[in-house]
Structure formats: structure tokens, C-alpha cells
Amino acid sequence: METILFQPLIVPAKTAVLLVFVPDSLTQQIVVNRLLERVGAELGDVVRITRVDQVVHPEVVRSFGVQQLPSFILLRQGAEIWRHNGLPDLADLMRLLTERLQEATNW
């Protein structure tokens, strides 16, 4: 049996992590990837975007209780601060992320 070693994800404490649970459909993956490219360009180092493929990491999908794909989960210092199921448009996604990040920094 082959052992696969994974490198830990090391993220500075001030950086939030956006977990994006991607669907199997290639068409939807392309749409999600384009959306995430724009989000990454807008938010830069404020958010680290990590795609989670349900086929490759089913245990991660289960651990977060994801029922619908795509799903977006925003984490700050290991705590979930926001979740969205389905595909939002860019303006809505940016507004929601920005609001949650601002709220999280005011704790």
C-alpha cells in the first residue's frame, strides 16, 4: 500500500482561509475556478483560497458537513466564520467575504 504524505497548510494567523468544495462537473469547475481567480486578485494576501475536491478528499468534505457543491467555507484562526452553499456571483461573494472578514477582525 502506497503512503501519501501531505505537507501541512501553514497560514499566518491574520490570514483567513477560504475552503472551496468543488463539484465533479468539469463545466462547474471551470466556472468556480474563474470566480476564484477574480476573488484572489481582489483580496490578495488577505485570504488563502484552498480548493477541496470531494473525490480526492471525501473525509474533509464529510468533516465539514458539506451537502451541496460548490460550497464555500471561510475560516479565521481555525474557526468557521461564514458558509455559503451554491455558486454566488462575484459581486455577492466579494461583499459577503469582505463583510465577514471585517467582522472577524473586530472580535
PLM feature spans:
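CheY-like receiver
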Residues: 8-9, 60-63, 96
